[in-house]
Every structure is written in C-alpha cells, then in structure tokens.
Curated annotation (Swiss-Prot):
InterPro entries linked: DHS-like_NAD/FAD-binding_dom, NAD-dep_sirtuin_deacylases, Sirtuin, Sirtuin_cat_small_dom_sf, Sirtuin_class_U, Ssirtuin_cat_dom
Keyword Transferase: yes
Catalytic activity annotation: N(6)-acetyl-L-lysyl-[protein] + NAD(+) + H2O = 2''-O-acetyl-ADP-D-ribose + nicotinamide + L-lysyl-[protein]
Gene Ontology cellular component terms for the protein in this record: cytoplasm
Keyword Zinc applies: yes
Record's protein name: NAD-dependent protein deacetylase
Subcellular compartments: Cytoplasm
Listed cofactors: Zn(2+)
A single GO molecular function term of this UniProt record: NAD+ binding
Enzyme Commission numbers on file: 2.3.1.286
Length: 246
C-alpha cells in the first residue's frame, strides 16, 4: 500500500470530529466470516446444495415452513466462535474517543457491538438479538445458542433472528437514524462495501461533508467522488494506522 495514502487517512481522521463509518461484508472477512455472496460464502454453499439462498433467507420460508426455517438459521447462521478484528476495534475506539458519531453497517454478525461500539445502525438487523414472532419476547444470541432455543419460553411460538429477511422492509427508524448520521458527518469512511446493494448503498449519496474515504479491495461506483480511495487489504491498512499511532 502507498505510504502517502496512509498518511492522508491519518490526517483526515485526526482532523475530523464527526466521523461516520459505513461498513460492509469485507470488514468481517478477517474474523472468519466470508462475504455472503463470495466464493465459499453462504450463498455459494447453499447453491451447491441445490437450494435457493434467497428463499431460505426469506419471510416466505418462515411462513411456509417454520421448522425448516428454524433449522436453517441454527445450522447456517449461528456461529459461536467469531470475534471482532482490528477494524471493528478501531471503529469502536474512535467512537469512545468521541471522534465518531457511530457506525452504519450492512452486516448482521453483531461484531461491531461485540467490539464495543454503541452507536450502531444495523440496516439489515443483527444475529445478536432474537424475538418471538407471536409475543415479541426477546432473547440474546448467547442464550439461544446455550439453550438450543427454538421456541419461545413464554408462549411456545417460534423465535427468529432480528434480521431483515428477503420480502421484508428495512426498519424505517434505523434508516432515518442512519441518514441523519450521514447528513451530520464531516467525514464518511466506507469500509469493505462494494456500494451496490440498494437501498443501503444509496445512503452514501446523502453525504455532504468534507471527506469521503473508501477502503475496499475492489472499485465501487462512488470512487470518483471520494477524497481518498484505497484498494487494498483492509486489515493491513487499519493495522498500519493503529501501529503508527501507538
């Protein structure tokens, strides 16, 4: 990676006080979670089994066959041993230093919360929370996994992860909070997102601040509008930043 890019990123971060982070699947790759749509990711694995990933992750699947839906998320989505990596930790650290307004994420893995971030807008929900589809009793991921819980202890109905399934709308309260963050940011740092999945990716066009920074292995549709673009391994980039500040 180019040293001038690292220095420019450091300067932008140091001179900003209202940073907003926008993160995609690339942020969690170093934690051992492949991009859903990448080779070896969840979609690839499901497709090899001759099934439709979009259907298995849909509200229709839940309505059509509750038992099948429950078994699917227990077998495919609940992963116990994945930990936040240096990128999640850096984002949380800047929030704790009051340099950041928070993070907007397309990810459902809950690793930003695990890393210590507090002001998180999870556009597609999170696997850290579950709720009953009948009485809305809430459960944590750890409780669900420890007790192999599939049905509500209060009413006996199905519990589901608090994620946005295909066929469901994004939570409008979360959307408005995310847009408000972006509109008040002086710097927007995009990490590990191709910025092609709508409507979430379109949020970037709402940014009117000073510096748009994009760090992603591949090009994005917004590269030409950015103050700084780094096409490199994200973990290496952030390690360089963290080590230079220590």
């Amino acid at each position: 990676m180019k040293k001038p890019d690292i220095q420019q990123l450091k300067d932008i971060v140091n001179n900003s006080n209202q940073i907003v982070f926008f993160t995609g699947a690339g942020v969690s790759v170093a934690s051992g979670i492949p991009d859903f749509r990448s080779m070896g990711g969840l979609y690839d694995e499901i497709s090899k089994d001759g099934q439709s990933p979009e259907y298995l992750l849909s509200i229709d699947h839940l309505h059509d066959n509750k038992e099948s839906f429950i078994n699917f998320y227990h077998e495919r989505l609940l992963i116990a041993d994945k930990k936040p990596n240096i990128v999640h930790q850096w984002i949380a650290q800047l929030e704790n230093q009051q340099k950041s307004l928070g993070v907007i994420t397309q990810n459902i893995d809950g690793l930003h919360e695990d890393a210590g971030s507090h002001n998180i807008d999870e556009l597609h929900g999170t696997l850290n929370r579950f709720y009953c589809i009948n009485c809305y009793e809430e459960y944590s991921k750890s409780y669900v996994m420890t007790h192999h819980l599939k049905y509500c202890e209060k009413c006996g109905n199905v519990i589901r992860p608090d994620i946005v399934l295909y066929g469901e709308m994004l939570n409008q309260k979360t959307v408005f909070k995310a847009l408000d963050k972006i509109q008040h940011a002086d710097t927007l740092i995009v990490l590990g997102s191709s910025l092609v999945v709508q409507p979430a990716a379109g949020f970037v066009s709402e940014f009117k601040g000073d510096n748009l920074v994009i760090i992603n292995r591949d090009a994005t549709p917004y590269d030409h509008t950015a103050s700084l673009v780094i096409h490199d391994d994200m973990t290496s980039v952030i390690e360089e930043i963290v080590n230079s500040n220590s």
